[in-house]
């Protein structure tokens, strides 16, 4: 059966859910950046929000690093992801004004060194496509003056970017009326009864509300209703290096194949590794070594100033977290549909995307997701939380220019299409 309300003939098959709960109450699962942003935006609109976190404190997974970089990986071609990143950067930047500069964030800028010919060409395209207020091409002398350390060449400078402490942003977002944080709560099952979503740990009811937002990164796919979400984990490890008298000369974040930030609380953060194979939560010497090699490539001068040594990694401190991404690296934000009903209703659409279905999308009333922010969470989660809250609250003005790829229904359609293509290939063998 279809859980969604029937759409009118004027609406497309994927028209937004028309479901409106009688009570403005929501349950958000996961208290990292995505969950805290979703909870904050809903509370700002007058909703009562229960925020469930499985750990003893918030921001313990991918949102727990001491320094997150406001890194704008843009495209000169105006892709959906590039649009989201550019918009999200400005939104996050405004929120950070509420935190203590120097301790919780710093607008020290981000410098992307042009480390090879391909990167130099990419940066030249960006410099033509975006205003100088957002990014500025620098020659070597200018780059070294701004960075405070010696570099191999010039690069692209983002003057309003910098670093922030993700846990501090999470705390600020949820320190407001209308949000109840419940720690040590890990729902394993969702059931819908009498217009309410019930979150259970075994047979123990943890919380209930007419609206649920799944915001626990890859854990968002642990429920029966969301198991189809095409999420993947990528292990990332950061390395902490004690600041030295000479390393404090670094004045901006350097971000190439990895990043190194100016010191916070007497320590520089560098990283993060990308490991698609391992899921071990313990820091490894091999990835510490990889991070140090990355630092040496970015700036041999800074490497020496930090007294770094790729042969001495046993005593280094670090942290491991799992990034969560989607196949096209766009975040997945919006309402969830019933995967089985979707597959039945749109089997023909999977074979021929040009068809125009008449059956309205089988939405799961009141169930939403905000996940797959990868390594861009500092930039994309606050705006995504606002987009999602607007959707839930029936305010669609923000969605007129939102990238289509952010909606789970597109991921479900692509999943169905991929399955059909695989079936077609199998039938030909």
Where do the PLM segments sit?
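N-terminal Rossmann-like FAD-binding beta1-loop-alpha1 element of flavoenzymes
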Residues: 24-51
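Glycine-rich FAD pyrophosphate-binding loop
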Residues: 44-64
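Dinucleotide-binding Rossmann-like beta1-alpha1 core, especially the glycine-rich loop
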Residues: 67-147
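Helix-loop-beta segment of a Rossmann-like dinucleotide-binding subdomain
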Residues: 76-77, 102-112, 140-175, 273-277, ...
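Flavin-dependent oxidoreductases
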Residues: 78, 200-293, 297-318, 323-324
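Helical element adjacent to the flavin cofactor pocket in flavoenzyme catalytic cores
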Residues: 156-197, 201-202, 206-211, 215
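C-terminal catalytic lobe of FAD-dependent flavoproteins
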Residues: 307-394
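C-terminal, low-complexity/hydrophilic appendages and adjacent surface loops
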Residues: 390, 394-427
């Amino acid at each position: 059966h279809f859980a969604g309300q029937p759409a009118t003939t004027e609406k497309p098959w994927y028209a937004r859910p028309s479901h409106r709960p009688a009570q403005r109450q929501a349950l958000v699962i996961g208290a990292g950046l995505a969950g805290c942003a979703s909870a904050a935006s809903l509370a700002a609109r007058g909703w009562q929000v229960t925020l469930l976190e499985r750990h003893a404190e918030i921001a313990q997974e991918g949102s727990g690093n001491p320094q997150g970089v406001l890194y704008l990986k843009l495209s000169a071609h105006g892709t959906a992801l590039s649009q989201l990143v550019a918009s999200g950067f400005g939104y996050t930047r405004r929120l950070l004004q509420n935190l203590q500069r120097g301790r919780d964030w710093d607008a020290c800028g981000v410098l992307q060194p042009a480390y090879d010919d391909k990167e130099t060409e990419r940066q030249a395209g960006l410099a033509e496509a975006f205003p100088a207020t957002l990014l500025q091409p620098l020659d070597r002398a200018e780059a070294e003056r701004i960075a405070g350390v010696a570099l191999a060449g010039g690069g692209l400078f983002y003057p309003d970017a910098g670093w922030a402490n993700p846990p501090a942003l999470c705390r600020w977002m949820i320190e407001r009326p209308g949000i109840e944080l419940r720690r040590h709560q890990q729902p394993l099952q969702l059931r819908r009864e009498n217009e309410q979503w019930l979150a259970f740990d075994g047979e123990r009811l943890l919380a209930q509300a007419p609206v649920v937002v799944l915001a626990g990164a890859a854990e968002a796919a642990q429920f029966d209703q969301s198991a189809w979400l095409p999420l993947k984990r990528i292990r990332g490890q950061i390395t902490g290096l004690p600041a030295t008298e000479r390393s404090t000369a670094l004045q901006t974040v350097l971000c190439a194949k990895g990043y190194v930030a100016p010191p916070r609380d007497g320590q520089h953060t560098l990283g993060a590794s990308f490991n698609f194979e391992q899921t071990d939560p313990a820091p490894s010497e091999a990835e510490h070594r990889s991070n140090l090699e990355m630092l040496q490539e970015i700036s041999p001068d800074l490497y020496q100033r930090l007294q770094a040594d790729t042969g001495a990694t046993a005593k280094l401190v670090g942290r491991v977290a799992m990034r969560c991404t989607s196949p096209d690296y766009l975040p997945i934000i919006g309402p969830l549909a019933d995967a089985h009903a979707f597959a039945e209703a749109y089997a023909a659409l999977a074979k021929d995307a040009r068809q125009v279905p008449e059956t309205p999308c089988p939405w799961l009333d009141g169930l939403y997701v905000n996940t797959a922010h990868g390594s861009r969470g500092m930039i994309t989660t606050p705006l995504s939380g606002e987009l999602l809250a607007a959707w839930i609250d029936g305010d669609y003005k923000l969605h007129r220019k939102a990238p289509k790829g952010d909606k789970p229904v597109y991921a479900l359609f692509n999943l169905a299409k991929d399955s059909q293509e695989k079936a077609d290939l199998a039938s030909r063998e």
